[in-house]
């Protein structure tokens, strides 16, 4: 999930296009995604693809093509800010529209790993700066002046001494004939006037008044609806079905078997096709299906936990090792050992899964909410055996993605049914489908050990992760990848350290979930660091600072959160505070959770967070993302879980899969660290630290350790 800080194998464009009086700028992607010398269109070698990212027309209209979907993370506001800053225009002058799904032109368009801002920050600045310099050069040529004698402001080029002015619209025809600068001068952060300022999201209004289009809203002429009955036991196979009563339901057109692929496993179902979703659902309820579930009904949460504990005895794959842990642990004066458990979790997106697909002859069209436009396009082309250029993907706003919408399985179902029916088909999952079918966040067992020497110093730490591997669900590899250990701070200055993982293979489907493995591992590691601090008779925050002397950014957020939370002040009666830290998507966060005893239960009073995400494009967006992810972290910490009994998910809807309620939401204070480091991802960083900070706060208040989630605030 974690993308590189720079866009791989991509050259910054130096291309301009002329289409009437239009200046277009973008990047070039070379054939095979190889780095090469960037050519202008007239001299471009075969395989060079030109893609306009911005267009400025003769009316001065500036259009930015956003090649990554908006799913609530705020890119529709932040991305134009980056361009406007370097282009020397006000934010209001930049219109943003979705770019078509086209890997050849736009590279990866997948929205994962909090990658949108950090992946586009420098390229968009370069595009804006290049356009600005070209427009200034065009004006200078017109006035027979040096470019240095001119400057740009609010979409106008001005001559410094004469005061002559020319709007961008007047200059685009001349500017489009110029060669773009190879290294346009970028503003220094101290000179930013747009980046770093708070501005309201431009999609707020349409989302509030109902104008914004989500996948589930899409309608096209001649469309039909589909509701699919799937086995409650994962990997169950359809033996037979009786659709007699289903076909008697008014509006039902057809009943068909279908399937989808989930991380290499085929999931079968029976689809009811109807003229309305209501009719499809009613027809589905009347279906009689015989399933072959094999021996899969033996699985339960209890068995899974037992298997995990047995697996913990294995050494596993070693991902990182410093010093000699075994020797240091054996010779430690104080030994600390603890295990931590986290359950499966559903994404439970506000907008249930859905997809609209129309297949005809050698052509396919998709409409829907997706984090992965390229993946949908590739999937449908492969599935239908048609050229990828014959697949058109229309991606909409998303009612939440959280990793679930990076998958293409729902589109696969819709395409299969559309091909069979010869009509556009919209597949809609019910809330029960969404919660019971997954894929889920992986459950995990974390086994931790630490040694404290005779001087009270932490001399050794070992952390072993036991869980499924998202990328290895078909049994192809015997060992888990190191990514399953994400979220474990390896920067603590402990001389003897070992990080390892043991792969567990189950048929229960898992996938990316907000913050992925950070959401489980951080709970274990930061809870354990707290236990180690208490065993060493040291303050938990102070111990972290002492172990992070050489880590500037983690030290900064810890010091800031200690100040903002009044960490070292005496606690009020019947309250407790806990602290935790994490690095996620390049951002660093320290969090303090404060709890209080209210009658017989515990209440979360306040969350205080300090965030270092590098250069802050829009502080409102960063704060909102931190608040939202913190609340989702609270839900996972003490409200929700997916449990398995007899091979089936026990939770069905929000009556059993509990979500945090508005009245349960605590005060949240977020402080942003001013920085000139490159901007990093913030969509997930606020989630992992909530559970450990909460558990540590409960320990300070009650003296009871929480080592299994979800915890109960009523039974502490």
Model-inferred region functions:
Residues 2-26, 35-716:
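Cofactor-binding beta-sheet edge motifs in enzyme active sites
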């Amino acid at each position: 999930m974690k993308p590189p800080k720079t866009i791989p194998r991509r050259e910054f464009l130096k291309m301009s296009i002329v289409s009437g009086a239009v200046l277009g700028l973008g990047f070039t992607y070379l054939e095979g995604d190889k780095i090469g010398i960037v050519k202008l269109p007239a001299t471009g070698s075969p395989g060079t693809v030109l893609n306009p990212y911005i267009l400025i027309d003769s009316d001065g209209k500036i259009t930015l093509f956003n090649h990554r979907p908006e799913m609530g993370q705020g890119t529709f506001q932040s991305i134009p800010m980056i361009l406007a800053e370097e282009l020397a225009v006000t934010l209001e002058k930049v219109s943003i529209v979705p770019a078509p799904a086209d890997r050849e032109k736009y590279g990866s368009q997948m929205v994962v790993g909090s990658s949108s801002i950090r992946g586009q920050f420098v390229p968009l600045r370069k595009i804006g700066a290049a356009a600005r310099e070209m427009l200034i050069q065009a004006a200078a040529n017109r006035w027979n002046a040096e470019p240095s004698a001119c400057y740009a402001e609010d979409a106008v080029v001005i001559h410094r001494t004469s005061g002559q002015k020319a709007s961008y619209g007047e200059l685009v025809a001349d500017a489009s004939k110029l060669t773009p600068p190879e290294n346009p001068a970028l503003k220094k952060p101290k000179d930013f006037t747009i980046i770093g300022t708070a501005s309201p999201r431009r999609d707020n209004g349409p989302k509030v008044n109902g104008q914004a289009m989500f996948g589930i809203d899409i309608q096209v002429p001649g469309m039909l609806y589909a509701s699919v009955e799937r086995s409650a036991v994962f990997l169950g196979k359809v033996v037979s079905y009786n659709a007699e009563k289903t076909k008697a339901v008014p509006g039902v057109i057809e009943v068909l078997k279908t399937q989808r692929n989930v991380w290499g496993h085929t999931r079968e179902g029976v689809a009811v096709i109807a003229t309305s979703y209501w009719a499809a659902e009613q027809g589905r309820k009347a279906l009689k299906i015989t399933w072959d579930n094999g021996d899969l009904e033996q699985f339960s949460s209890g068995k899974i936990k037992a298997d995990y504990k047995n697996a913990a005895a294995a050494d596993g794959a070693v991902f990182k090792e410093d010093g000699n842990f075994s020797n240091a642990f054996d010779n430690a004066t104080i030994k600390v050992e603890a295990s931590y458990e986290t359950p499966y979790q559903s994404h439970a997106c506000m907008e249930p899964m859905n997809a609209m697909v129309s297949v005809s002859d050698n052509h396919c069209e998709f409409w829907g909410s997706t984090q992965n436009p390229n993946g949908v396009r590739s999937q449908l082309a492969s599935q239908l055996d048609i050229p990828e250029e014959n697949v058109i993907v229309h991606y909409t706003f998303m009612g939440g993605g959280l990793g679930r919408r990076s998958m293409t399985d729902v589109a696969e179902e819709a395409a299969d049914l559309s091909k069979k029916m010869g009509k556009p088909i919209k597949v809609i999952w019910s809330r029960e489908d969404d919660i019971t079918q997954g894929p889920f966040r992986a459950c995990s067992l974390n086994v931790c050990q630490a040694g404290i020497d005779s001087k009270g110093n932490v001399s050794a730490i070992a952390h072993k992760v036991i869980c499924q591997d998202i990328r290895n669900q078909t049994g192809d590899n015997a060992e888990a990848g190191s990514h399953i250990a994400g979220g474990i701070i390896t920067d603590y200055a402990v001389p003897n350290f070992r990080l390892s993982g043991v792969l567990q293979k189950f048929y229960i489907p898992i996938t990316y979930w907000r913050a992925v493995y950070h959401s489980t591992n951080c709970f274990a590691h930061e809870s354990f660091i707290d236990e180690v601090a208490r065993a060493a008779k040291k303050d938990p925050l102070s111990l972290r600072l002492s172990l992070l002397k050489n880590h500037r950014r983690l030290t900064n957020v810890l010091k800031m959160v200690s100040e903002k939370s009044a960490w070292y002040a005496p606690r009020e009666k019947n309250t407790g505070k806990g602290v935790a830290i994490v690095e996620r998507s390049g951002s660093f966060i320290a969090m303090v959770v404060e709890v209080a005893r209210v009658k017989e239960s515990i209440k979360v009073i306040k969350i205080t967070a300090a965030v270092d995400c590098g250069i802050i494009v829009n502080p409102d967006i960063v704060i909102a993302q931190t608040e939202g992810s913190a609340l989702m972290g609270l839900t996972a910490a003490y409200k929700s879980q997916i449990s398995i009994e007899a091979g089936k998910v026990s939770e069905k809807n929000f009556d059993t899969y509990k979500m945090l309620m508005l009245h349960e939401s605590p005060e949240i204070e977020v402080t942003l660290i001013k920085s000139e480091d490159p901007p990093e991802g913030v969509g997930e960083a606020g989630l992992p630290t909530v559970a450990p900070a909460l558990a540590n706060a409960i320990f300070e208040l009650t003296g009871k350790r929480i080592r299994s989630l979800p915890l109960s605030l009523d039974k502490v």
